[in-house]
Design a protein with these regions (language model features):
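N-terminal membrane-targeting/pre-transmembrane regions
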Residues: 1-39, 139-141, 154-155, 166
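Transmembrane alpha-helices and immediately adjacent membrane-cytoplasm interface residues
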Residues: 49-64
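Non-transmembrane, membrane-adjacent beta-strand/coil modules in membrane-associated proteins
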Residues: 75-140
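A composition-biased, non-transmembrane "mature-region" signal
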Residues: 82, 98, 152-154, 163-166
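Terminal membrane-proximal soluble interaction domains of membrane-associated proteins
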Residues: 131-138, 142-157
Length: 166
């Protein structure tokens, strides 16, 4: 049972861009099929691939962050998770709410690797410039994007028995 749960969606323009790319690819395929005089037995394959890719992309544009009594779980994907990162609370040495620069520090939003405060860091984010910085026992560093970074930092630190730095 989660003690903290946050659902984040990417900004609306990302969905519109994905839809435009999807329908543009389908339209281009239809024009090519019609201009070549109809389809052969395998003409449906590019359309099916575009449809499948479109569903996968739309699915990925959703991020859920949960804190339970024993772990922090970040999941990318709404209908079927395509990426899940689990961090045991016992492995967390430091927790603090931070403001970062997604484009400069991480190269954008999503599942990213970049630099934060001069050291390598993994980023899991969907929107905005606020998140929770985690320093892990194995030396890895992680920033989890959040629209409510202070509440997430408080939940993680409370369950991990640490003091949150907000």
């Amino acid at each position: 049972m989660p003690v903290f749960r946050e659902e984040q969606r990417y900004p609306r323009w990302v969905y519109l861009l994905a839809a435009a790319a999807f329908f543009g690819a389908l339209f281009a395929e239809a024009v090519e099929t019609l201009s070549s005089g109809g389809g052969g037995p395998y003409e449906w394959i590019p359309g099916a691939l575009a449809g499948t890719l479109g569903i996968l992309v739309i699915n990925l544009l959703f991020m859920v962050t949960e804190v339970t009594r024993t772990e922090l779980v970040v999941t990318m994907g709404r209908f079927f998770p395509l990426y899940r990162r689990r961090v045991a609370l016992a492995d967390i040495l430091e927790v603090r709410a931070v403001t970062y620069r997604p484009l400069r520090d991480a190269g954008g939003w999503g599942i990213r690797w970049g630099r934060f405060e001069g050291s390598r860091c993994a980023f899991l984010n969907a929107r905005g410039d606020r998140g929770v910085f985690l320093n892990l026992r194995n030396g890895k560093r992680l920033i989890i994007g959040s629209q409510n970074a202070e509440a997430l930092a408080e939940a993680v630190s409370r369950e991990a028995g640490l003091s949150a730095q907000v």
